[in-house]
């Protein structure tokens, strides 16, 4: 693996330029055609989403982070267009187009039309925020029965995804781990350096143990162009079915990953929320649909995949701390600690357990086995 710094270094994050004029226009109900009664705004570390009428308008923040660069108009246009391409296969009825924010000859800004583009937005069909799996989970309303169709959809997504056999699966993950650990060192607070050192040592050791397996999996076609950001905030219940959206659009290399590593993000998120029964149902369905017998040995890398995903979520939440209000900062800091704790937890080896279930026909052996596994 690449060398990992032993001490913190300055964090190179460009918080970007002034998009206030564009934000003002997108926040104004009269800017839309036809005008809307009101506009709601949702903020993430990389975008601002404006909910207006039946549509949502996603504005990329003018930022440059270690893992994404939206610092110019040209880059934001490119990434908006690519977001449409990346998501239309699985979320065709959500994504509409990339649209410019233009300066009219009068000097005013408009959403679309003829004029000089000064920014870009992704236009989507709006959905009820209550139907996000993230919100359903927080409110205790996420049915475990949705885990099977969700896992089947992910299995189909992975089956259709383009493989990249020439890539080295071990090198791909090693780069992710190195970047994540460097980001932790650069961030300093809210993580103790001793915690970062401990995680770094354990995950590097685990990757070294699984290096041959990871290389073999990429050679056998398990490394593909995946979703890349497969957690509960990027799944919505629409017409009674789970829909994946918001696949990584700013760097395809971050999405060219092992299919099990892609799937691990969802498992980690369910585990993080104490939805272990949901995780088990999702895992078992996915394995039965998408993992052939010869691919079962890949499950040996699952602890590393889960740990890396938890660490990445902690890293992204660290970046979010600086852009939220004080009340939400406390919540974000707790999330960071919880994610980092989970990253340590899943790397702890546990002894396997074999359970045999017996009984007469029709007494519920299969139901009990499904609940236990």
Show which residues each predicted segment covers.
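Extended, well-ordered alpha-helical segments in internal regulatory regions
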Residues: 310-322
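Glycine-rich phosphate-binding loop of ATP-dependent small-molecule kinases
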Residues: 286, 323-373
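Generic helix-packing signal
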Residues: 84-87, 184, 318, 347, ...
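Hydrophobic alpha-helical scaffolding
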Residues: 12, 253-256, 272, 297, ...
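Short regulatory "switch" loops immediately downstream of catalytic or recognition motifs
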Residues: 1, 101-107, 320-324
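Conserved ATP-binding subdomain of kinase catalytic cores across diverse folds
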Residues: 20-227, 232-312
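Cysteine-rich, disulfide-bonded extracellular modules and peptides in secreted proteins
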Residues: 2-27
């Amino acid at each position: 693996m690449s060398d990992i710094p032993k001490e913190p270094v300055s964090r190179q994050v460009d918080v970007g330029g002034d998009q206030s004029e564009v934000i003002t226009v997108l926040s104004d109900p009269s800017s839309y055609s036809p005008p809307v009664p009101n506009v709601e705004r949702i903020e993430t570390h990389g975008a601002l989403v404006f909910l207006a009428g039946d549509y949502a308008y996603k504005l990329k923040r003018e930022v440059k982070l270690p893992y994404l660069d939206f610092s110019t108009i040209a880059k934001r246009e490119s990434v908006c267009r690519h977001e449409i391409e990346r998501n239309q296969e699985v979320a065709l009825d959500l994504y509409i187009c990339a649209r410019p924010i233009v300066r009219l000859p009068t000097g005013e800004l408009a959403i679309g039309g003829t004029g000089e583009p000064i920014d870009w937005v992704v236009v989507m069909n709006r959905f009820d925020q209550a139907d996000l799996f993230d919100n359903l989970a927080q409110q205790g309303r996420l049915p475990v029965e949705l885990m099977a169709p969700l896992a089947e959809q992910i299995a189909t997504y992975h089956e259709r995804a383009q493989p990249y056999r020439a890539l080295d699966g071990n090198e791909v993950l090693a780069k992710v781990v190195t970047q994540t650990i460097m980001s932790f060192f650069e961030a300093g607070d809210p993580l103790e350096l001793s915690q970062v050192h401990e995680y770094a040592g354990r995950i590097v050791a685990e990757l070294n143990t699984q290096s041959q397996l990871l290389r073999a999996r990429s050679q056998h076609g398990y490394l593909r162009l995946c979703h890349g950001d497969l957690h509960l905030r990027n799944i919505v219940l629409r017409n009674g079915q789970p829909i994946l959206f918001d696949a990584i659009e700013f760097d395809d290399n971050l999405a060219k990953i092992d299919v099990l590593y892609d799937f691990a993000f969802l498992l980690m998120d369910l585990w993080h929320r104490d939805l272990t029964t949901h995780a088990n149902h999702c895992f078992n369905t996915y394995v039965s649909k998408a993992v052939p017998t010869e691919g079962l040995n890949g499950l040996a890398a699952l602890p590393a995949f889960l740990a890396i995903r938890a660490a990445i979520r902690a890293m992204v939440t660290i970046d979010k701390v600086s852009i939220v209000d004080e009340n939400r900062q406390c919540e974000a800091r707790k999330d960071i600690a919880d994610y980092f704790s989970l990253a340590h937890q899943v790397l702890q080896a546990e002894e396997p357990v074999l359970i045999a279930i017996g009984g007469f026909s029709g007494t519920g052996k299969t139901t009990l086995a499904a609940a236990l596994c």
